[in-house]
């Protein structure tokens, strides 16, 4: 059984026991969070109807609330003027473990 959930502005395919990275959530380590479901597949049975999906919930436990993504370097350059700028960014992430699809 797996589900497609909306987590942190993205859609993720999850099963029970999966550990996923999502954009920073407002939750502390050890908290339980619930994600809205877009699709559920259980063997040959596929659930897409909004009325049926309202009954389904995906629960996850926050494993780490202070993770960071890889460093991304941004460069801006203007030719013949000597203008150059460098900037870096690291996305703040939350690591969650899927505990239940019910």
Curated annotation (Swiss-Prot):
PROSITE patterns: RIBOSOMAL_L21. InterPro entries: bL21-like, bL21-like_sf, Ribosomal_bL21, Ribosomal_bL21_CS. GO terms for molecular function: rRNA binding; structural constituent of ribosome. SUPFAM superfamilies: L21p-like (SSF141091). Keywords: Ribonucleoprotein, Ribosomal protein, RNA-binding, rRNA-binding. GO terms for cellular component: cytoplasm; ribonucleoprotein complex; ribosome. GO terms for biological process: translation. Belongs to the bacterial ribosomal protein bL21 family. Part of the 50S ribosomal subunit. Contacts protein L20. This protein binds to 23S rRNA in the presence of protein L20. HAMAP family: Ribosomal_bL21 (MF_01363). This is Large ribosomal subunit protein bL21. It comes from Bifidobacterium longum (strain NCC 2705). The gene is rplU.
